[in-house]
A protein has these predicted regions:
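Active/ligand-binding-proximal structured segments within catalytic/core domains
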Residues: 13, 20-70, 253-265, 273-278
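Short beta-strand-initiation
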Residues: 3, 11, 225-227, 273
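Short, well-ordered turn and helix-capping elements at secondary-structure junctions
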Residues: 14, 32-36, 74, 245-247, ...
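His/Glu-based metal-binding/catalytic segments typifying zinc-dependent metallopeptidases
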Residues: 20-24, 29-31, 214-271
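Non-catalytic terminal extensions that flank enzyme cores
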Residues: 1-15, 25
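Charge-rich, well-structured scaffold segments of protease-associated domains
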Residues: 2, 9, 66-215, 221, ...
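Histidine-centered active-site/metal-ligand motif
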Residues: 48, 52, 152, 240
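Short, conserved beta-strand segments within well-ordered enzyme catalytic domains
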Residues: 17, 27-31, 54, 78-80, ...
Length: 408
């Protein structure tokens, strides 16, 4: 599985990463190094709000023209906001790359944020918030991060708060984008059958009016982690439970070991230890999963399950039993080999999703200015020892390090 990439930095500071392939479908877009954690206290929800408004009008296009520009050639225009980045991108037949790069440059750098569009979009996002709050199996993930990062932007809901959203004006969105939507604070990525020299030429042309303007913003680091246990009473037909702690940041060498342990415990395979214990053997849950998120300076490890109210304690005991097994005894040679083989296969299969691969490339290059070759990832996994996994287990899964959030 070969991975090739080309990298170039424009005079205005915009970095370009290009991953060529022979597919008829290409992906390209801008990734901005700004997300929910970069909002001021009075801007909660602004990163996501701006992402919505990028499609609502520029100096030369109305919203309808933006929506139809790629649709007319069968393409797709999309965006998402995360805690640490915002990505605006398009999927299209490779021959339409010039159209895509011109449109994306226009909406990312020249959006005007008309007030009448803001007033309409506020109601759309509030409806999104209400829909989200009706889904406890999703909402609990945000509430758990708030438990892990109290009084810190990483603990905030990406969607924001209705009372603040109603206060947002055009100048607020313009102020936010002028602070973060700068060429040196983002990257342009493209994956597909598009010539690299052509990519550089067209991106440079579309961003020729931009200049580098290095800011002084520094992200606030989280305070020292103190485990918390919280039970909230909600009117739901089943209980929802989160167990976990802060994890390793994306630079930490131990992250690969935790990644493998996370997969052993509650990865997507039906043979994960938690799925076998709680669902297959006990019939206590429909869904149980373990998740790992790495930020630039911290991370989150968590286990989620939903069960009948009367079965919460039993499920908790089974989860802690599986965690204790990993702490008490290193994996055998056979267990370690099987775990490595499974996760390497899963990564290989996941790379068959071109859109996911393009977005993953963008996120990695944005934050770390490099791109991992899959073979390098596989080598790091293969190099892991049982002793390393055992040490990480005892560091991460010790009961006195775990936080718990329960919806009853």
């Amino acid at each position: 599985m070969l991975f090739r990439s080309n990298i170039h930095t424009l005079p205005n500071g915009l970095r370009i990463i290009h991953a060529p392939n022979q597919s008829a479908v290409a992906y390209c877009g801008f990734a901005v190094d700004a997300g929910t954690r970069d909002e001021a206290d009075n801007e909660q929800g602004m990163a996501h709000f701006v992402e919505h408004l990028l499609f609502k009008g520029t100096k030369k296009r109305h919203a309808w023209h933006i929506l139809n520009r790629m649709e007319h050639v069968g393409g797709d225009l999309n965006a998402y906001t995360n805690k640490e980045e915002t990505i605006v991108y398009s999927a299209f037949l490779a021959e339409h790359f010039p159209r895509a790069v011109e449109l994306l440059s226009d909406i990312v750098f020249h959006s005007t944020f008309p007030q009448h569009e803001i007033d309409k979009e506020v109601e759309v996002i509030i409806d999104e918030i209400q829909s989200y709050e009706d889904s406890p199996s999703e909402l609990i993930f945000d509430d758990f991060e708030e438990l892990l990062f109290p009084n810190h932007p990483l603990g905030r809901n990406i969607l924001g708060k209705p009372d603040l959203l109603h206060q947002f004006k055009s100048e607020d969105a313009l102020r936010f984008t002028s602070r973060y939507y700068r060429p040196e604070n983002m990257i342009f990525f493209v994956q597909g059958n598009v010539d690299f020299k052509r990519v550089v030429r067209l991106v440079e042309k579309s961003t020729a009016d931009l200049t580098s303007n290095i800011g002084t913003y520094t992200r606030k680091h989280p305070d020292i982690y103190i485990p918390q246990n919280l039970t909230l009473h909600r009117d739901t037909h089943q209980a929802h439970v989160m167990i976990g702690s802060r994890g390793y940041d994306a630079h930490n060498e131990k992250r690969t070991a935790l990644y493998l342990l996370n997969n052993i415990l509650g990865g997507p395979g039906m043979n994960s230890r938690l799925n076998v214990s709680l669902r297959e053997r006990s019939g206590l849950v429909y869904n149980v999963e373990a998740n790992l998120t790495s930020y630039t300076d911290t991370g989150v490890f968590c286990i989620y399950f939903g069960t009948e109210h009367d079965d919460v304690d039993r499920c908790m005991r089974l989860v802690k039993k599986e965690l204790k097994k990993l702490c008490d005894k290193p994996l055998s040679i056979a267990q370690l080999a099987a775990a490595k083989k499974q996760i390497i296969g899963q990564i290989g299969v996941a790379r068959d999703n071109a859109e996911s691969t393009a977005l993953g490339m963008a996120k990695t290059f944005l934050h770390y200015n490099k791109m991992d070759d899959p073979q390098e990832v596989f080598q790091r996994i293969e190099a892991l020892t049982s002793k390393e996994l055992w040490e990480v287990s005892n560091e991460m899964f010790a009961e006195n390090q775990l936080s718990t959030l329960i919806y009853l």
